[in-house]
């Protein structure tokens, strides 16, 4: 095989079986309290395509009365040479390495989520806003619909409108991350003012084909611009400048997707010039703009 998928760490417990489909793991007429995968002790070793996903692994170990053991699994996909270098980090002192990295992860998220905190009489409401709403906004920002579009084969890049909208949810939590993504999406705006309906993962500002080119249509399956894609830059840039006070951002020079460059202000102006004649032809879900 050319790729690693998963690997037991430390006192290696060989992975016996796995499952990527939630319904198969839970089983018919079963639920989270009695999943058939746990009852049977074995899984179907099948992945999942465009259904409800899960990640389940089984391993066999023996415990003496009162004994407990900890297991660690490294899950992901890399080419063999890259994967072996990652796995090597855990070959010595696996437990200490895992504990240290877990603490680093906890510290990272506490830091990210601490930038905006509310306090109301409702602990549940506080937790929803301070933790889960914010965390969900980060996940949406980072993954940009990957689970719902990319992994099921419906998209092979970033959706312009989706990605620009997602930035708004983290501006108050991570303004520098937000600014970098705004710059990225501005660089995916064509010099005519429209946004690339699909921004490739290999995006190369200043050198991209556009929906006007047969090569772009063939590669992405998108034969036309959307009327409102680039217009979503307006509320996003406005919210970033309002939150940070960084008015100089408007004067930054950023390349267009296919050729030329312009200030952020010029990008916004061209978005209006492109879209004003295309009003009333937008995604029904986003007509509020």
Per-region residue spans from a language model:
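Short glycine/serine/threonine-biased micro-segments
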Residues: 6-8, 74, 151, 157, ...
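Acidic/polar, glycine-enriched structural segments that form the non-catalytic walls/loops
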Residues: 14-45, 50-51, 56-157, 251, ...
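Single conserved hydrophobic/aromatic residue that forms the stacking wall/gate
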Residues: 2-13, 280-289
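Short Gly/Pro-enriched turn/cap motifs at secondary-structure boundaries
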Residues: 3, 48-51, 222-224
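Aromatic-rich carbohydrate-recognition surfaces in CAZymes
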Residues: 66, 158-163, 167-178, 182-279
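Intrinsically disordered, low-complexity regions of eukaryotic proteins
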Residues: 4, 23, 164, 230, ...
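Short glycine- and Lys/Arg-enriched binding-loop motifs that mark or flank ligand-binding interfaces
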Residues: 4, 155, 189
């Amino acid at each position: 095989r050319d790729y690693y998928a998963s690997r037991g760490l430390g006192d290696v417990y060989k992975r016996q079986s796995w499952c990527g489909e939630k319904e198969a793991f839970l089983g018919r007429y079963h639920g989270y309290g009695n999943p058939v995968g746990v009852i049977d002790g074995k899984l179907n070793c099948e992945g999942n395509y465009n259904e409800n996903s899960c990640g389940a692994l089984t391993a066999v170990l023996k415990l003496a009365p009162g004994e407990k053991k900890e297991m660690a699994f490294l899950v992901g996909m890399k080419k063999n040479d890259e994967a072996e270098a990652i796995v090597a980090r855990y070959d010595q002192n696996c437990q200490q390495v895992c504990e240290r990295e877990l603490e680093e992860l906890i510290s990272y998220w506490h830091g990210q989520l601490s930038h905006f905190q509310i306090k109301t009489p409702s602990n549940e409401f506080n937790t929803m806003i301070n933790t889960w709403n914010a965390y969900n906004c980060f996940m949406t920002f980072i993954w940009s619909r990957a689970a719902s579009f990319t992994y099921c084969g419906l998209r092979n890049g970033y959706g312009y409108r989706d990605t620009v909208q997602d930035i708004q949810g983290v501006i108050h939590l991570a303004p520098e991350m937000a600014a970098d993504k705004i710059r990225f999406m501005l660089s995916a705006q064509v010099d005519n003012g429209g946004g690339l309906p699909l921004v490739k993962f290999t995006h190369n500002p200043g050198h991209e084909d556009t929906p006007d080119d047969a090569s772009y249509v063939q590669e992405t399956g998108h034969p036309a611009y959307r009327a409102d894609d680039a217009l979503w830059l307006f509320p996003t840039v406005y919210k970033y400048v309002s939150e940070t006070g960084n008015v100089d951002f408007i004067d930054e020079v950023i390349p267009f997707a296919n050729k030329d460059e312009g200030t952020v202000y010029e990008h916004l102006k061209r978005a209006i010039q492109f879209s004003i004649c295309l009003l009333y032809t937008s995604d029904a879900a986003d007509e509020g703009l």
